[in-house]
Amino acid sequence: MTNTKILPLVLMLALFSFAACSEQESSPRSDHGDSQTGTSGEQLLPDPGVVSFTFRNQFDEDVPGTLDFIKEIGINNIEFSNLFGKTAEELRALLDERDLICTSFGANYRTLTENFDQVVHDAKTLGARHVRLAWFPHDAPFDLDDAQRAVDFFNDIGRRLAEHDLMFSYHNHGYEFVEDGDGTLFDYIVQNTDPEYVHFQMDVFWVVWPGHDPVELLERYPDRFRLMHLKDMRKGVTGDLTGRTPDRNEYMVGLGDGQIDFQAILEAAQNTSIEYFYIEDEIEDVMNSVPRGYRHITSLTH
């Protein structure tokens, strides 16, 4: 049997499993890194989105079926950085058929520099307002010269995207937290970019991995972050400044299973300019871990 025949069956089984366990897992888990949650109150995050990279293998095989699975979980908002063999028009039609939306579109450095018009077309066709860059090319380790180049590029690309009514956000990836004076090179980038044209997407994993605190960063720059990636880190592990992990499955876990305190982060995020939050799960068992993570993150209250 071919993979294309197998995947729809897998999606159907996953949907059945999700529906069956939703009733069983209605209360917050007690063995995660989050602060203690109450049994009543307002949801901190009632409507999280998801990053398409989470379901990259499933999208590669069956785009409509994967969208159906995401919708069944309760997720309505997807950040795409890949069209998975479709045109932007075709993908938009599939989203519209399911009342799904795309609010952010990811593009890499090369695409932004060499195919800018296509990025604009795809983002606007999908309905995204935000264009996100998740990696700035550099020779490790990231240094002040790299940060200065990044500042120049971000200011320029942010202005160009604004001309098309699009907002540019840079997604931190851990390597920017090299110490520099009284702060880090991430501080240097934030402080030297134009807040009118340059925004940021906080990936909480890639803040914790190099040893920093997402809450402190949100409190320091409450008006600079527009987007957030929610991704958990295995308990007991520590990271570095490379911006990479040796093995995703060794260091990353489903939301609520690791050491990151999402209760505290989402509390702090209430006082910031963040518009959209996206679940990003990079482990192998996303068909089970994402529904569980969704139930966990939407159970947090204040």
Residue locations for each model-derived region?
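Alpha-helix-loop-beta-strand connector modules within alpha/beta enzyme cores
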Residues: 92-107, 154-157, 191-195, 262
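Bacterial N-terminal signal peptides that target proteins for export
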Residues: 1-8
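Histidine-acidic metal/acid-base catalytic patches
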Residues: 22-52, 59-71, 127, 190-202, ...
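Acidic-and-aromatic substrate-binding clefts and catalytic sites of carbohydrate-active enzymes
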Residues: 55-61, 77-89, 107-115, 138-142, ...
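A cross-family glycoside hydrolase active-site/sugar-binding cleft signature
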Residues: 49-53, 79-81, 103-108, 132-134, ...
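Short acidic, glycine/proline-enriched helix-loop-strand junctions
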Residues: 87-105, 150, 164-166, 297
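Active-site acidic/histidine proton-transfer and metal-coordination neighborhood
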Residues: 77, 109-199
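C-terminal motif of bacterial Sec signal peptides marking the signal peptidase cleavage site
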Residues: 17-20
